[in-house]
Amino acid sequence: MSEQPTEPLSIKEEYQLWRKNCRYMYEFVSETALMWPSLTIQWLPNYTTTNGLIDAKLLLGTHTSNQSANQLKVASTQLSADPNVKANSKIKTVQKLENNAEICRARYMPQDANIVATINGLGEVDLYNLDTETRYSHFAPHTKNGYGLSWNPKQKGLLVTGADDNFVCVTDTTTNKTTFKSDIQKDIVNDVKWHQFNGNLFASVSEDSHVYLFDARDNKVVSQYYAESSNGINSLAFSPFAENLVAIGNTSSNINLLDLRKLGENSGLLHTMMGHSEGITCMEFSPHHDGILATGSQDRRIIIWDLFKVGEEQQQEDAEDGCPELFMMHAGHTAGVSDLSWCPFKDWMIGSVADDNIVHLWEISKKLITNEEAEVDVSILE
């Protein structure tokens, strides 16, 4: 008799299978349920270590669907700094700061982590001082919902934003004056980021399937790329190690790697990575390891990619598990992933949030990393 096709697992069954295998993939995993879903997450860089425990904080937001006041939240958690000391890594809210609408993104200023910017569902930007627990500035560079929000890592106070009104704006937050506004995009702007090395360059991606690279000195487009088969571009990330590398995440579920030096309307594509089954929602390069990229998707998955594995030969059985650059898949969320953040002070730790109201904090198993980083003993090839 021929084998009957197996029924796909339900979301609940997938989750149970993931929980069963957690001990093989992670040093630890923490799950905390929120009252309201958070569309944003970011580790704060400041932490303290006492008696083998790290006291850390994260930025979160709320999306209450107008059933309650929306808030920027600061959450605290404990992580283990000593393998012999067990931490309770459930998070708890320690600060709540009100906002006029759901918070789509919240990001701290690189030069002063006590200053946090948010962009909300109305396209408004708010600036908060965590030390004084105040919202000290409010302006509206956009007229519609916005997800694009990025602080300039080189020039203090410069903030670039992008929103559903098709605009990209640069604001000097010391004066709240808009220094640049672009309407070259023909559709919703989904993400904006400053370049990691050059404080004058930033990029946007949008539903019109274009990447635009801007120069803030001239207020003009330096170059552009059209991702024809993307069905719209949702996210981008500049590499913190390779100044000419940018990654974009598409509605089509694919990730494109681009070379800024060769960027043109139909050129600059280095490689396309396939592993997700639905649109990409967020992405971030590891700040610790060159070539390591994390991507989140509507398919409820986060994939860790190792770009140095691109093009490696595979055995047939390995190829069935995915392309060589697919290092690891985090499959614990039960709804689309909204945002993710690499921990700035623990190499292989990520925080992630999804539409299921759950915050995940997870550290990749040292055994997986050791296998990934193991070098071939050349003596066995002689």
UniProtKB/Swiss-Prot annotation:
GO terms for cellular component: cytoplasm; nucleus; Rpd3L complex; Rpd3L-Expanded complex. Its main location: cytoplasm. Keywords: Chromatin regulator, Cytoplasm, Nucleus, Repeat, WD repeat. The keyword Lyase does not apply. The record marks L245 as: Important for interaction with HAT1. Gene3D superfamilies: YVTN repeat-like/Quinoprotein amine dehydrogenase. It is found in: Cytoplasm; Nucleus. It comes from the Eukaryota. WD repeats lie at residues 98-138, 141-181, 184-224, 228-268, 275-315, 332-372. InterPro entries: Histone-bd_RBBP4-like_N, WD40/YVTN_repeat-like_dom_sf, WD40_repeat_CS, WD40_repeat_dom_sf, WD40_rpt, WD_repeat_RBAP46/RBAP48/MSI1. GO terms for biological process: cellular response to reactive oxygen species; chromatin remodeling; DNA repair-dependent chromatin remodeling; negative regulation of pseudohyphal growth; regulation of DNA-templated transcription. Residues 317-321 are annotated as: Interaction with the histone H4 N-terminus. Regulatory subunit of the histone acetylase B (HAT-B) complex. The complex acetylates 'Lys-14' of histone H4 which is required for telomeric silencing. PANTHER family: WD40 REPEAT FAMILY. Component of the HAT-B complex composed of at least HAT1 and HAT2. The HAT-B complex binds to histone H4 tail. Belongs to the WD repeat RBAP46/RBAP48/MSI1 family. This is Histone acetyltransferase type B subunit 2. It comes from Candida albicans (strain SC5314 / ATCC MYA-2876) (Yeast). The lineage of its organism: Eukaryota, Fungi, Dikarya, Ascomycota, Saccharomycotina.
